[in-house]
Amino acid sequence: MNQHDPLHTCKSCQNEFTGTFCNHCGEKILTPSDKSFKTILNNIILAFTLVDSRFVKTLWMVIKSPGALSRDFSNGKRVMQLSPTALFFVLNLIYFFFPVIQLFNASLNTQLMSPLRGFYSDLIAHKVVNMGVDLNSFTLLYNLKTTSLAKLMVMVFVVVSSLPLNFLYWKKNKYFMDHIGYAVELACFNLFINIIVLTMIMRLVGGGGYLDETALTVIFIVTNLYFVLRSSHTFYHEKGWRLLVKSITLILFLKVALEVYRAILFFITMASL
């Protein structure tokens, strides 16, 4: 250490030190250059660079080896990749800020194709009269509101979809939070494959007009069957005919969970208008 180095007082812990960083808490001396736009931009790029390798590695693990992330996280192997929850919030952030295919979102037209459409129609008619607007105006207001709410409520789907896991795999000695972690990984898979990637493909080929509710349901079933078959073997150690039967059963539960989530979204949207 140079004896001519100036003595600084740490802004965080009041420790006196020389150099750039506090030797007690690690706080950095703030200089005018640290407040420049260039430095701020460099710090943002650096932050993304440091996270990027783990993010890409974790995302690739979810796609290539479904269930491995949940297994490693449950077993305490957590340093080399992001946690399922951290990955979920990164993907949900992308989902929140960009216009994408509505899987977790559901327009008024989509809601009116649900098994509860008769009940929904009566509520909508009553709401339209109370608001004093026509159906077209109400549809516009509803769709704007439900889009923003849906992007905040994806975790509701995670919780709902985790409930059947406790029933299907109760002999596997898994904790409730293990099932939640698995459901979060499943949500990450759907956010990336069935929303982000599918949106990019449709934008490139211009086939968005063909993606009606039936097409989305088929894609949802096929992609999730791939995930569930692979992940149930990896995470729950299922195999043979039990793996197939439980995977198909879980797909049915996931479709029900999606409808339950959309029903919750409908009632919250209606209440907020």
What is the predicted function of each stretch?
Residues 1-273:
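Membrane-proximal intrinsically disordered regions of secretory-pathway and membrane-system proteins
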